[in-house]
Amino acid sequence: MLCFIQGMFLITSSSCGYALRTSKDAPRFSQWGVRRVYIRPIQNETFRAGVENSVYTQTVRMLSSTPGLRSVNSPEDADAELVGTVSLAQRTVSGETKASDLNPKNLGSPLLLVASEYTASLACSFALTQKGKILWSGEFRRSRPFPANSQVGALGSTGALINESEFERALGEVAADMMVDVRSSLTQDF
């Protein structure tokens, strides 16, 4: 029993540099005098309607989980404002296959290439401002592959609608992944 107690004492007293964070662990924000942040509506500079909503939702989630910070509903109640812009939201073909390989009856042309995979890309920039002064800013870009619906000659095929739906879902996931980078940069968690 004494060995067990000594072992536990050694384990707890020898620190490896990791510790649980508390809500008071926000030295960077304390230095700036920031505890409450207003998130401005995200600006959309792309031709992709609605992408700013996914980014805004993920930004609110990220800020809500950041120790020492609290999101507020009006700029008057805030110590600082987080401003964001979406500069790129697109999908590109990242995998192709011959149309004749997709149809068992070989109705498709062997010369016609059909997308079998896309890559969703998202680029955003953010800035934390206080009374017109920029406290922090950063630009972020993330991508993620997603499968394409490549049915050829199928009656009632809704390939375009399915691809569009998958793209929307992938953009939401990319935005969530991007917020990990934003939070790390904002809080300097390395």
Regions found by a protein language model. Name each.
Residues 1-14:
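Sec-dependent bacterial lipoprotein signal peptides
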Residues 67-70, 75-166:
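Surface-exposed short loop/turn segments
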Residues 14-68, 73-76, 154, 183-190:
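A structural "domain/chain start" motif
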Residues 47, 51, 116, 166, ...:
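Conserved acidic
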Residues 52, 56, 60, 86, ...:
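Extracytoplasmic/secreted envelope proteins and their assembly/folding machinery
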Residues 157-190:
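Compositionally biased, intrinsically disordered linkers/stalks adjacent to structured regions
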